[in-house]
Design a protein with these regions (language model features):
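A penicillin-recognizing enzyme superfamily signal
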Residues: 2-72, 83, 90-93, 164, ...
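Short active-site loop at a secondary-structure junction
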Residues: 30-39, 63-68, 91-111, 124-130, ...
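Proteins synthesized as precursors that undergo proteolytic processing into mature forms
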Residues: 41, 89, 117, 124, ...
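Conserved catalytic neighborhood of penicillin-recognizing serine enzymes
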Residues: 76, 121-180, 227, 240-279, ...
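Active-site SXXK
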Residues: 77-78, 101-129, 161, 217-221, ...
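Short acidic, glycine/proline-rich loop/turn micro-motifs
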Residues: 92-97, 140, 197-200, 339-343
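Extracytoplasmic/secreted proteins, especially bacterial periplasmic and envelope-associated proteins
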Residues: 103, 111, 115, 122, ...
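Mid-domain, small-residue-enriched loop/turn segments at the edges of structured enzyme/sensor domains
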Residues: 140-146, 178-216
Length: 403
């Protein structure tokens, strides 16, 4: 086949190995059978996109309808490390990282569990994962929440519920904790209380925020409970190298330290209890080993925590992963919400993008497992009932509790 490349050069492409790879789309959930030949599917005058790999082998490509956004931040300083607003700036100036506000889906759950842990619940608390019907006046209907698997798992510890992203337990947890108390707590991360829904659907991430804000709020977990203000620009210099702008938010502290010749001793302020931050992060680290984020194991690092997110009908998917040095969140979906397909989840769409980004830079990121804060103890428990383990118990493990 003869094609015209982006440099207006006419080249010949061997397409004999491509035909077997082409399947026409029927809908978001189905593909047709392999085409028999190019001429049976394409016509003269059709515009076909090709792309080549490093070996100059060509394959059929598409200009995607689906979009994505990525925000990467240093959770200690707030410096933005990377920001991607979409597939192509030339085709769309819309910055999805900043302007889009897709629903969070299950990526919201760590915030709810943090509220629970700071209000009397703990990772060993048992909540029954069983069918339940809520009559919610704000939803104006009876609501029967379901897990993504369609199954129910019986009495479940909150640790297991978060790392396996169980919907039913999460909704029951919010119902027990209370919507008003939860909304008050969420303002500590930066959520606007009056914008949050007044119904139980908030438990499953019915609220939408930008990927940029999601990265900012998640940084509280990565930063040991402390909130940061993101910074885009550190300094600007002119063509002659003269500094014409410098971010001065830490300038007075730095100058004073230089004058007195030693670091200032500052009282740290926390948005949330550092013990809560540690416990949530510990659960999300475990989620990367045996939960919904286990594909992270490909990095061969155990200091990263992560949480997937999938909204109702798979209209938006998320993955947020972090350690103390870097936090990156990825959103994946359409500008005008519609289903990505029944088999698409945060683990199959957003997580691979996160992983591709991290694989390029992971060797430069310092190994940084979270430090256990004061007044947090580990106790051996019976994993079936969450109670202190007895000498005769077989199914046991350690869990963290506030001292």
């Amino acid at each position: 086949m003869t094609i015209l490349n982006k440099d207006s050069e006419i080249i010949t492409v061997d397409i004999s190995n491509l035909v077997a790879k082409i399947k026409p789309k029927i809908d978001e959930n189905k593909k047709g059978k392999n085409i028999e030949s190019f001429s049976s599917f394409f016509e003269v005058g059709d515009l076909i996109w090709f792309r080549s790999d490093e070996n100059k082998k060509f394959e059929i490509a598409m200009h995607p309808e689906v979009q994505s956004a990525l925000v990467s931040i240093d959770p200690r300083s707030g410096k933005i490390l990377a920001l991607v607003g979409g597939y192509s700036f030339n085709s769309s100036k819309y910055n999805r990282a900043m302007q889009a506000k897709p629903q969070l889906g299950s990526n919201f759950k760590p915030f709810l569990y943090a509220a629970a842990f700071e209000n009397g619940f703990n990772p060993a608390t048992i909540i029954n994962d069983a069918p339940v019907v809520f009559e919610d006046q704000n939803l104006e209907e009876f609501w029967r929440p379901k897990n993504a698997s369609g199954k129910f798992y019986g009495p479940t510890r909150l640790r297991e519920a978060l790392l396996q992203s169980r919907n039913v337990v999460t909704v029951r947890l919010l119902n027990d904790l209370g919507i008003s108390k939860t909304k008050n707590y969420l303002t500590r991360f930066g959520f606007e209380r009056d914008s949050l829904p007044e119904d139980l659907s908030i438990a499953l991430g019915s609220y939408g925020i930008s990927p940029y804000k999601n990265a900012e709020f998640f940084s509280v977990f990565a930063n040991g409970g402390k909130k940061i203000n993101p910074t885009y620009i550190e300094k600007i210099v002119d063509k002659d190298g003269n500094e014409i702008f410098f971010d001065q938010k830490d300038l007075s502290k730095t100058t004073l330290e230089q004058w007195i010749g030693k670091p200032l001793i500052e009282e740290e302020t926390f948005a949330i209890d550092p013990r809560v931050s540690f416990v949530v992060t510990d659960i999300l680290r475990e989620a990367t080993r045996r939960g919904t984020g286990r594909a992270i194991k490909k990095l061969q690092r155990d200091d990263f925590a992560g949480k997937t997110g999938t909204t109702n009908n798979s209209e938006s998917t998320w993955f947020t992963g972090y350690n103390n040095k870097i936090l990156t969140t990825v959103w994946f979906g359409f500008d005008q919400p519609r289903s990505l397909g029944q088999k698409e989840y945060g683990s199959t769409t957003a997580l691979p993008i996160w992983l591709g980004y991290m694989e390029d830079i992971v060797d430069s990121i310092e190994y940084s497992p979270p430090v256990i804060p004061a007044n947090l103890i580990a106790k051996k428990i019976n994993l079936a009932n969450g109670l202190d383990a007895s000498p005769s118990d077989q199914n046991t493990g350690f869990e963290y509790f506030f001292d």
